[in-house]
C-alpha cells in the first residue's frame, strides 16, 4: 500500500553530513527515502513538524514502481515489474515521482504490507528527510539506495573523568579516522579501480555497480545530453545484460553531473544449476561500459525514448529546480548541463558522434567497480575481475586522449588542411594514422566535477546578487531559497567529525525554535527548512534556507525565518539543548552500531560511492559509533555555538560589509493568487521588496531561548498502578466457543492475544533489526464512514489531531522532545478504510515502554485544539485550489470524480464540504471509530515475550475503550457510474508555456478477498461455474488436481492471481506501448485492492505528447483487452512468479514487512484474513496457473461500458482551461515548490 505523506505542513527533517557509516539510523529509518535520490551528506532542518505526523492515504496515489525505500520498511509493491522492465532513470527525482497522482493505492501484491511505516515521523526531525540539488539521470528499475544523510537523532554526551591537556587534545583531534576494516580496494594494470565489501543482507545476493566518471558536466556545447544518451544505448543495447534477466537479476543505470553508473543486483548463483553468477554479471558490465554497440536502430529507439522523457518530465517542479540550480551555479557549467540535455541537440546526433564521446571518456582508468554482498571468497572475486576487465583497453592499447579544441564542434571548419594525423589531433577526431601514435596514458580527472565555484566566505570581495524571481502560472505557493556555497570539508580526522557533530547539535535546535512559532491559528509560513549539505555531484557544500508560504503571507514568513536564524546565531543553543541532542545522537549512533549486520548491500555501496566522491573516510557502523563517542567527550557549549554561528552568518549578518554573501537568493512565485471575495488577482513582487523583508526581519528584537522541561515519562509508575487497580487489565479468550487466551503459530512465530477491553494484539519476535521494534494500531472505519453531511470529517480530523500534537497536560514541544529522548518515530494516518498510528522505537532505556505510553496517551488523553483544526482546514482548502495547476492531478481528479459517481470520500474535501465542518464534528468522526473491538495492535521486533506482553497489559489493557462498534452500519453505498454516460471518456486542458500530456484509464476490479461491487462473492461464482465439472469427476481424481482446487478456494486466491496478472500486464504495456510503438516513455498498470470495502479498481497511467496521447490510450486499451487473443504463456507467468517471490523472500527480513503481514489478522471487518494467508503465501504463488489468472482476469472489467478514461493536455493552445469552479472536489495538492534539484533527475525507462 502506498504511503502518501501529508503535504508539507508537517514536513521537517534534520539530517547531518556526513554519515560516516552506512545504514539508516533509527530516527530516520522510518522516514520515506526516495531511491537513489541523493547520495550525499546533509544536515537538513525543517519546520514546523508535529510529534504526531499525519499522513492521509488516498485512493489516488502515486506509482509504486520502486524498491524498498527505507531500512525496515517493506517495499510498497511486492509486485511491481521486476527484472524485465529495465531502462534509465532520467530527469525526475525518485522522491518527487511519488507525488504524481495515479489512481491505484496498491501496486499488485497479494497481501498489503505497508501502511506507512516507511513514512514514520522522526521524533527529532519532525518529518521526512529532504534530499536536494541532485540533477541525476538514472536507470530502468529503480535501485534501493542508501540515505546519504544521518538521522536527526544520534549522539550522547559522555564526559571524561579527567581533563585533557590542550596539546593532547589537538593531537587526538588531528588523528586520522579509522578506515572500514572489511573494505578491499585495488586497481588493475589498465587503471580500473575496484572496491569489494562482504555483506550479509540480503542473503545470497550481491550488488555490482560500474561507475564511469563522466557525466553531463563533461559535455561540450554541442553534446548536451549525450552522456545520458550513451547510458540509454549502452545499457539497453546489451545482450549479455538481457541474458541475466532469467536468473532473477535486476539492473539499472543513471547519469548525473559527475558520473554515470550501471548496476546489477544479482543472486550469487543460478537457481537451477547453482552456477556462480559473478562472472556473468561482470561480463555484462564490461560490455555495457566499454564495448557497447551503437547501432542506428538502437540509437533511434533511445532518441525517441529520451525525447518523450524530456517532454514528460518537464513539470513545474523540474522547471523550478532548474531555476534554483541556474542561479546557484551561475558562474560555472553546472547551471546549464542538466543530464537530460537539450531537445534540439538530441535530435541531431548520429551514432558516430555518440561513439566519439564514448571513446573519449569510457575507459578503465576512468571507472570504478563496486562489489558488495555475499562475496565470501574475495581472492576469487579479484581473479574474476582481472579475468574479465584486465584486457579491456589496457594501457598499452589505450587510444590517444582526445584533446578538446577551443572551437568545440566547429573545430573541423577552422582547422587547416594538414596531414590526417595532425588535423585529427586539432579537431579532436581520430584518423587511421592515430593508431601509429604512441598511446597516451589516460587518467581520471583529479577534481570531480571539474568546475570552479564562487564561494560565500567572509571577506571575499564580490558583488552581491539581487534576489532573482521566477514567476509562473503553474506555481501555487510562494517559496524563497537563500543559498550559501563553501568548499567541502573532507571528514578524515576526529577534528572533522567533531565539527560535524557540533553543527548537528546547533542546527537541530532551529527546528524546535521555529516550531514554537507554529502554534498560532494562522502561521505566516507553511514550512521553514535549513539544509547544510555536502554534494559530491556539485563539488561543494551548500547551506540553504527555504521558506514556503501562502503568497499573501510571504513578507511575514521571511521575517519570522530570518529572525529565528539570527536569534539562534546570536544567543546560541542552551546547555539543555546541547545535552538533549547529544544524548539523542549518541543513542541513535549506538543503535546503528548494533545493526551493523543488517544493512542492505546497496545502502553500503551507495554510501561508499558518495563518501569517496566527497573524499570522506569510510568507516563501518561500529567504528562510526566509537569515533562519535570519542569526540563527544571533547565538545563544549561555547564551541558548538561558535561553529554553528558560522553556518548561519550569510543569513544573520545579511547586508553587513564583512558578511559572506549569499550565492543566490531565488523566489519562485505564482502569477495569480486567489483572494477571498475577489477571486484570481495578479501577484506582484519585486527584488527590493524581498531584500527589505529580510532586513526587516533581522532588525526585530531578539530574546534568548528559555529552557524547556522535557518529561522523562508520560505516565508515572504510581499513575499506572492506579489504572491497573481500576481497570484490571487481562487477556481474554480469543474464541467464543473455546477458552483460548493465546494462539502461537510455530511456523511463522506469530502470537495472537486479545485484551479484556476488546483490543486485539498480534506480535512477532524477530532479530531482523537488533533491539528495534515497530508497532501499528489499526482502527476500522476510515473515510468510508463519512456521510453526505460530513464529507472530509475523518481526513480533517486526523490532520487536526496531528497538528495539535498534545496529549494530556503535555505540550506539543514536550511530546516531541519526549520522542527525541526515547528514539521514537510516530505517524498518524488515514485512508478510506482505516485510521492508523505507527511507531518505530529502540528497546534500549525502556524505549518500548515509552512508545506504549505515547500510544496510551493518544487513546486516553488526546487533545483537540481549535487552532489545529483551523490549520488543517486551511491546508486542505489550499490543496483543493492547487488542483487546476497540476496536469496529472487535474486529470486524475476528473477520472475519479466520474468513475466513483461523484463520491467525495475518495478524494480531497471541497471548500463547500470544509465549510460545514466544526472541531466537534471532526473529533466525533475520528474518535467514534476508536472502540475496543474495532482496534488491532501489531508489534514486531527484537523483544522478549515478557517485555511485549507486559507493555500490552500495562498500557493497552488500561485503555477504557468501548467494546462494540457500529461503524460498518454507517457506510453509505459506494458505486461506479453506470453506462452509458458522457463521463466515461473526458479530457482536461491546462494552460502552460510548454506542451505535455498524460492519461489515466481505469475500471472496476474485485477487492483483495474476492468481493465485488454490490457485495458479490466471486468464490461463489467460481464454485458455480465449476459445478458441472465436479459432478462428472471420477472418484479417482488426481491428487494434484484436488490440491489445485483447494488453491482456488483459498481466501487469498484473488489477491495472488491479480498481483501476478498485474505483473504480466505491466510487462506487456512496456513492451508494446513504450518499446515497440514508441508512444510513451512511462506507462504502468496498478491495482487498488481494498480489504474491507467490497470493491477495487485498476488504473493504467500513461504519459505522452499531445500528438500521441490518444494513440497511446488506444494502445493501452488494446493491451488490456488483448489477453484473450494474445494468450499468457508460461514464460510470462514464471517471470512474474519469480519477481514476486524474490521480493517476498527479501522483505521477510524486515520488521515493517511483517507488520504489514500481521495487519487485520483478527479484524472482524476482514474475516478472510487468517494465519494461512501468511503461511501459504509462497505455495499460492508457486501453484498459480495460467487458467487461474484468466479466472481473475474475467473479473477485471475491461469492456467499453465499464472502462473510464481521461486525457490531460497542457500547452499554450490547449483548449478550454480547467478552473477552480469546475472542481467539485479535489485530490492531494502539490507541496510547496522548494528544494534544489528535486525533479531534475532522469525518469525510469520502465
UniProtKB/Swiss-Prot annotation:
Keyword Ubl conjugation: no
Tissues where the protein occurs: Widely expressed.
GO-annotated biological processes: protein processing
Gene3D superfamilies: Metalloenzyme, LuxS/M16 peptidase-like
Superkingdom as given in the UniProt entry: Eukaryota
Active-site residue numbers: 231, 302
Compartments, as annotated in UniProt: Plastid, Chloroplast stroma
EC identifiers of the protein: 3.4.24.-
Cystine residue pairs: none
GO molecular function: metal ion binding; metalloendopeptidase activity
Keywords: Chloroplast, Hydrolase, Metal-binding, Metalloprotease, Plastid, Protease, Transit peptide, Zinc
Role: Cleaves presequences (transit peptides) from chloroplastic protein precursors. Initially recognizes a precursor by binding to the C-terminus of its transit peptide and then removes the transit peptide in a single endoproteolytic step. In a next step, pursues the cleavage of transit peptide to a subfragment form.
Protein name: Stromal processing peptidase, chloroplastic
Amino acid at each position: 500500500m502506498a504511503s502518501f505523506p501529508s503535504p508539507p505542513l508537517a514536513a521537517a527533517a534534520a539530517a547531518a553530513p556526513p554519515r560516516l557509516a552506512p545504514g539508516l539510523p533509527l530516527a530516520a529509518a522510518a522516514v520515506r527515502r526516495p531511491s537513489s535520490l541523493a547520495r550525499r551528506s546533509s544536515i537538513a532542518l525543517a519546520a514546523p513538524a508535529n510529534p504526531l505526523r499525519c499522513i492521509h492515504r488516498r485512493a489516488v496515489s502515486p506509482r509504486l514502481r520502486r524498491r524498498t525505500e527505507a531500512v525496515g520498511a517493506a517495499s510498497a509493491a511486492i509486485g511491481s515489474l521486476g527484472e524485465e522492465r529495465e531502462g534509465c532513470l532520467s530527469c525526475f527525482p525518485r522522491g518527487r515521482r511519488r507525488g504524481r497522482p495515479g489512481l491505484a493505492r496498491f501496486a499488485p501484491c497479494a497481501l498489503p504490507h505497508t501502511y506507512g511505516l516507511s513514512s514514520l515521523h522522526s521524533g527529532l526531525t519532525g518529518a521526512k528527510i529532504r534530499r536536494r540539488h541532485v540533477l541525476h539521470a538514472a536507470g530502468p528499475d529503480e535501485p534501493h539506495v542508501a540515505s546519504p544523510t544521518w538521522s536527526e537523532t544520534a549522539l550522547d554526551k559522555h564526559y571524561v573523568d579527567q581533563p585533557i591537556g590542550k596539546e593532547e587534545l589537538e593531537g587526538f583531534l588531528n588523528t586520522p579516522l579509522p578506515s572500514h576494516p572489511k573494505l578491499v580496494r585495488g586497481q588493475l594494470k589498465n587503471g580500473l579501480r575496484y572496491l569489494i565489501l562482504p555483506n550479509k543482507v540480503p542473503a545470497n545476493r550481491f550488488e555490482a555497480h560500474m561507475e564511469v566518471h563522466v557525466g553531463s558536466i563533461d559535455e561540450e556545447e554541442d553534446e548536451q545530453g549525450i552522456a545520458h544518451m550513451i547510458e540509454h544505448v549502452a545499457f539497453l543495447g546489451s545482450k549479455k545484460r538481457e541474458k541475466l534477466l532469467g536468473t532473477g537479476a535486476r539492473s539499472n543505470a543513471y547519469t548525473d553531473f559527475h558520473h554515470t553508473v550501471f548496476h546489477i543486483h544479482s543472486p550469487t548463483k543460478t537457481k537451477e544449476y547453482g552456477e556462480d553468477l559473478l562472472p556473468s554479471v561482470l561480463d555484462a558490465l564490461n560490455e555495457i561500459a566499454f564495448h557497447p554497440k551503437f547501432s542506428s536502430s538502437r540509437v533511434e529507439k533511445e532518441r525517441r525514448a529520451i525525447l518523450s522523457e524530456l517532454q514528460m518530465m518537464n513539470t513545474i517542479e523540474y522547471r523550478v529546480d532548474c531555476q534554483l540550480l541556474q542561479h546557484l551555479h551561475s558562474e560555472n557549467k553546472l547551471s546549464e548541463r542538466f543530464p537530460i540535455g537539450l531537445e534540439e541537440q538530441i535530435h541531431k546526433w548520429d551514432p558516430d558522434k555518440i561513439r566519439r564521446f564514448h571513446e573519449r571518456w569510457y575507459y578503465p582508468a576512468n571507472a570504478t567497480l563496486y562489489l558488495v554482498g555475499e562475496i565470501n571468497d574475495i581472492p576469487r572475486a579479484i581473479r574474476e575481475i582481472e579475468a574479465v576487465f584486465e584486457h579491456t583497453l589496457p594501457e598499452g592499447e589505450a587510444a590517444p586522449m582526445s584533446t578538446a579544441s577551443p572551437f568545440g564542434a566547429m573545430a573541423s571548419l577552422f582547422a587547416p588542411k594538414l596531414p590526417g594525423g595532425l588535423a585529427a589531433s586539432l579537431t579532436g577526431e581520430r584518423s587511421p594514422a592515430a593508431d601509429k601514435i604512441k598511446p597516451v596514458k589516460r587518467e581520471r580527472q583529479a577534481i570531480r566535477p571539474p568546475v570552479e565555484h564562487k564561494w560565500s566566505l567572509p571577506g571575499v570581495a564580490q558583488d552581491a546578487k539581487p534576489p532573482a524571481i521566477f514567476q509562473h502560472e503553474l506555481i501555487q505557493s510562494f517559496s524563497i531559497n537563500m543559498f550559501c556555497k563553501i568548499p567541502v570539508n573532507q571528514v578524515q580526522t576526529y577534528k572533522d567529525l567533531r565539527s560535524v557533530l557540533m553543527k548537528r547539535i546547533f542546527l537541530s535546535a532551529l527546528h524546535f525554535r521555529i516550531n514554537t512559532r507554529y502554534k498560532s491559528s494562522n502561521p505566516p509560513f507553511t514550512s521553514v527548512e535549513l539544509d547544510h549539505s555536502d554534494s559530491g555531484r556539485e563539488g561543494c557544500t551548500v547551506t540553504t534556507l527555504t521558506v514556503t508560504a501562502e503568497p499573501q503571507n510571504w513578507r511575514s514568513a521571511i521575517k519570522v525565518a530570518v529572525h529565528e536564524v539570527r536569534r539562534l546565531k546570536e544567543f546560541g543553543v542552551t546547555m539543555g539543548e546541547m545535552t538533549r541532542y547529544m544524548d539523542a545522537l549518541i543513542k541513535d549512533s549506538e543503535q546503528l552500531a548494533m545493526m551493523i549486520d543488517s544493512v542492505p548491500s546497496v545502502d553500503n555501496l551507495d554510501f561508499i560511492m558518495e563518501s569517496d566522491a566527497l573524499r570522506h573516510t569510510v568507516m563501518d557502523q561500529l567504528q562510526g559509533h566509537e569515533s562519535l563517542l570519542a569526540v563527544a567527550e571533547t565538545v563544549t557549549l561555547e564551541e558548538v555555538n561558535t561553529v554553528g554561528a558560522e553556518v548561519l552568518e550569510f543569513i544573520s549578518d545579511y547586508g553587513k560589509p564583512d558578511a559572506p554573501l549569499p550565492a543566490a537568493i531565488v523566489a519562485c512565485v505564482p502569477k495569480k493568487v486567489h483572494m477571498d471575495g475577489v477571486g484570481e488577482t495578479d501577484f506582484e513582487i519585486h527584488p527590493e521588496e524581498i531584500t527589505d523583508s529580510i532586513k526587516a526581519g533581522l532588525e526585530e528584537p531578539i530574546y534568548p531561548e528559555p529552557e524547556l522541561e522535557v518529561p522523562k515519562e508520560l505516565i508515572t509508575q504510581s499513575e499506572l498502578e492506579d489504572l491497573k487497580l481500576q481497570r484490571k487489565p487481562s487477556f481474554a479468550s480469543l474464541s467464543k466457543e473455546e477458552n483460548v487466551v493465546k494462539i502461537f503459530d510455530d511456523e511463522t512465530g506469530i502470537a495472537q492475544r486479545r485484551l479484556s477491553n476488546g483490543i486485539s494484539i498480534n506480535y512477532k519476535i524477530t532479530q531482523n533489526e537488533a533491539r528495534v521494534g515497530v508497532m501499528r494500531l489499526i482502527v476500522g472505519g476510515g473515510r468510508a464512514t463519512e456521510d453526505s453531511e460530513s464529507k472530509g470529517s475523518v481526513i480533517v480530523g486526523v490532520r487536526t489531531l496531528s497538528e495539535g500534537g498534545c496529549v494530556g497536560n503535555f505540550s506539543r514541544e514536550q511530546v516531541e522532545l519526549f520522542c527525541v529522548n526515547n528514539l521514537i518515530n510516530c505517524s498518524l494516518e488515514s485512508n478510506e478504510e482505516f485510521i492508523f498510528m505507527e511507531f518505530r522505537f529502540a528497546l534500549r532505556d525502556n524505549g518500548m515502554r515509552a512508545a506504549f505510553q505515547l500510544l496510551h496517551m493518544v487513546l486516553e488523553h488526546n487533545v483537540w485544539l481549535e487552532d489545529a483544526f483551523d490549520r488543517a482546514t486551511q491546508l486542505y482548502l489550499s490543496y483543493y485550489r492547487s488542483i487546476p495547476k497540476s496536469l496529472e492531478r487535474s486529470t486524475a481528479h476528473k477520472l475519479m470524480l466520474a468513475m466513483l459517481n461523484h463520491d467525495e470520500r475518495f478524494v480531497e474535501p471541497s471548500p463547500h464540504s470544509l465549510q460545514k465542518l466544526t472541531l466537534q464534528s471532526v473529533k466525533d468522526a475520528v474518535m467514534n471509530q476508536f472502540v475496543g473491538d474495532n482496534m488491532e495492535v501489531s508489534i514486531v521486533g527484537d523483544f522478549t515475550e515478557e517485555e511485549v506482553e507486559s507493555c500490552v497489559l500495562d498500557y493497552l489493557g488500561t485503555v477504557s475503550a468501548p467494546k462494540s462498534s457500529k461503524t460498518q452500519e454507517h457506510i453509505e453505498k459506494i458505486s461506479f457510474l453506470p453506462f452509458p454516460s458522457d463521463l466515461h471518456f473526458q479530457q482536461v486542458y491546462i494552460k502552460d508555456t510548454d506542451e505535455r500530456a498524460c492519461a489515466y484509464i481505469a475500471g472496476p476490479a474485485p477487492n483483495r478477498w474476492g468481493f465485488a461491487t454490490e457485495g458479490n462473492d466471486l468464490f461463489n461464482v467460481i464454485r458455480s461455474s465449476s459445478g458441472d465439472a465436479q459432478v462428472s469427476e471420477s472418484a479417482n481424481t488426481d491428487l494434484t488436481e484436488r490440491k489445485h482446487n483447494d488453491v482456488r478456494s483459498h481466501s487469498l486466491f484473488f489477491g495472488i492471481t491479480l498481483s501476478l496478472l498485474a505483473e504480466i500486464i505491466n510487462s506487456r504495456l512496456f513492451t508494446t506501448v513504450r518499446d515497440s510503438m514508441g508512444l510513451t516513455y512511462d506507462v504502468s498498470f496498478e491495482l487498488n485492492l481494498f480489504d474491507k470495502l467490497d470493491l477495487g479498481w485498476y488504473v493504467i497511467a500513461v504519459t505522452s505528447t499531445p500528438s500521441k496521447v490518444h494513440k497511446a490510450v488506444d494502445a493501452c486499451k488494446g493491451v488490456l483487452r488483448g489477453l484473450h487473443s494474445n494468450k499468457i504463456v508460461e514464460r510470462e507467468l514464471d517471470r512474474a512468479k519469480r519477481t514476486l517471490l524474490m521480493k517476498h523472500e527479501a522483505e521477510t527480513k524486515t520488521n515493517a514487512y511483517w507488520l504489514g503481514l500481521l495487519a487485520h489478522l483478527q479484524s472482524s471487518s476482514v474475516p478472510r484474513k487468517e494465519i494461512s494467508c501468511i503461511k501459504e503465501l509462497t505455495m499460492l504463488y508457486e501453484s498459480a496457473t495460467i487458467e487461474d489468472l484468466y479466472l481473475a482476469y474475467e473479473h477485471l472489467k475491461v469492456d467499453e461500458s465499464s472502462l473510464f478514461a481521461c486525457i490531460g493536455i497542457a500547452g499554450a493552445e490547449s483548449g478550454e482551461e480547467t478552473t477552480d469552479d469546475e472542481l467539485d472536489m479535489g485530490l492531494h495538492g502539490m507541496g510547496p515548490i522548494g528544494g534544489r534539484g528535486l525533479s531534475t533527475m532522469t525518469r525510469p525507462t520502465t
